[in-house]
UniProtKB/Swiss-Prot annotation:
Keyword Signal: yes
Taxonomic placement: Eukaryota, Viridiplantae, Streptophyta, Embryophyta, Tracheophyta
EC number: 3.4.19.9
Leader sequence residues: 1-23
SUPFAM superfamilies referenced in this protein's UniProt entry, alphabetically: Class I glutamine amidotransferase-like
Domain of life, source organism: Eukaryota
Name by which UniProt lists this protein: Gamma-glutamyl hydrolase 1
Pfam families: Peptidase_C26
Cellular component, GO annotation: extracellular region; vacuole
The reaction(s) this protein catalyses: (6S)-5,6,7,8-tetrahydrofolyl-(gamma-L-Glu)(n) + (n-1) H2O = (6S)-5,6,7,8-tetrahydrofolate + (n-1) L-glutamate
């Protein structure tokens, strides 16, 4: 016996499918039916003339070989950890190495080729290195004061040196126990993230930054919020965005943004999550990688606002591509790759 209810349901299903198919066919148009001329290329919007789509970041080298002398005994050698180069490239920029001990005339000619600067991590706080950082930092302020948008990232040692320069106090730093651990970031109450590197972070990632260990700490020194605020020069120049707590539950300033300049200071390492593997403490989760990516994108988005567009050939002749990185990760600690500079190869 035929079940009339089943026949009715089958007919209803056929009619529903037919209706959906008809609706789909009416909404999907072939190129010839849409008025689009397939023989012509689509019209793209014009680039913003106020942005530089070929930004170059200068990264200052640091004394040594980056591997405690395992790679070279040349006392004049300097290095840049490749993770900083990859960090800038991940944001969409090219890199020119600023070799700190080459003739100042050459160094500052190179500085005229870039749209922003990174002061890296390391240990050198005195003598020639400090003086070069101070001169480059002063130049960066002058360029911004003259109307050019010129961003600076000071990471770990870079932030420490900027703090010493601004405060004019070498004793502003104190010891902390944060030499090899991941941590969260504690955002200052009522802080405004507009115009900071955190502005483009998705809300969920910002929330995780304050609860999960997504940033890498690798430093012995820092500044307490109290000492920071007690120094008029420092507190008027920078705004504190985040703090961190070290292994002894001692609080230090971890992220700052200059109030009048596109300058950001980190007492953590945004570059390590994606590009360093020597320490098991470095976070490599998807969220941690996004932290690196957003920090890199912010730096380069600021560099695009620089309208400094030097002669192309001079840029090409001084790019990091003219050098080869050295793999030094066999020891299972420290950097994975470094660029070592023993003889300047600048071309002007």
């Amino acid at each position: 016996m035929i079940d009339n209810n089943c026949l009715y349901k089958e007919e209803l299903n056929r009619n529903s499918y037919s209706g959906l198919a008809k609706e789909a066919s009416e909404s999907i148009l072939l190129p010839s039916e849409s008025g689009f001329d397939g023989s012509r290329s689509p019209v793209c919007s014009s680039p913003d003339p106020n942005l530089n789509y070929r930004p170059v970041i200068g990264i200052l080298s640091h004394p040594g070989d980056g591997a405690s002398g395992r790679l070279t005994n040349d006392t004049s050698s300097t290095y840049i950890a490749a993770s900083y180069v990859k960090f800038a490239e991940a944001g969409g920029a090219r890199v020119i190495p600023l070799i700190y001990n080459e003739p100042e005339e050459v160094l500052f000619q190179k500085l005229e080729l870039v749209n922003g600067v990174i002061f890296t991590g390391g240990w050198a706080k005195k003598y020639d290195y400090f003086e070069i950082v101070k001169k480059i930092f002063t130049k960066a302020l002058e360029r911004n004061d003259a109307g050019e948008h010129f961003p600076v990232y000071g990471i770990c040692l870079g932030f420490e040196l900027m703090s010493i320069i601004i405060s004019q106090n070498r004793d502003i730093l104190e010891r902390f126990d944060a030499e090899d651990n991941a941590s969260s970031l504690q955002f200052v109450d009522n802080v405004n993230n507009d115009g900071t590197l955190f502005q483009r972070f998705p809300p969920e990632l910002l929330k995780k930054l304050s609860t999960d260990c997504l940033v890498m700490q690798k430093h012995k020194y820092g500044i307490t919020p109290a000492n920071f605020q007690a120094n008029p020069a420092l507190s008027s120049f920078f705004e504190i965005l985040t703090t961190c707590i070290d292994e002894n539950s001692k609080t230090y300033v971890s992220t700052v943004k200059a109030k009048r300049y596109p300058i950001t200071g980190f007492q953590w390492h945004p570059e390590k999550n994606a590009f360093e593997w020597g320490s098991s403490a470095i976070p490599h989760s998807e969220d941690a990688i996004q932290v690196t990516q957003h920090a890199a994108s912010y730096l380069v988005s600021e560099a695009r606002k620089s309208l400094n567009r030097p002669e192309s050939q001079k840029v090409l002749s001084n790019l990091i591509y003219n050098y080869k990185p050295t793999y030094c990760g066999y020891a299972g600690r420290g950097y994975d790759e470094v660029y070592i500079f023993t003889q300047p190869r600048s071309r002007f």
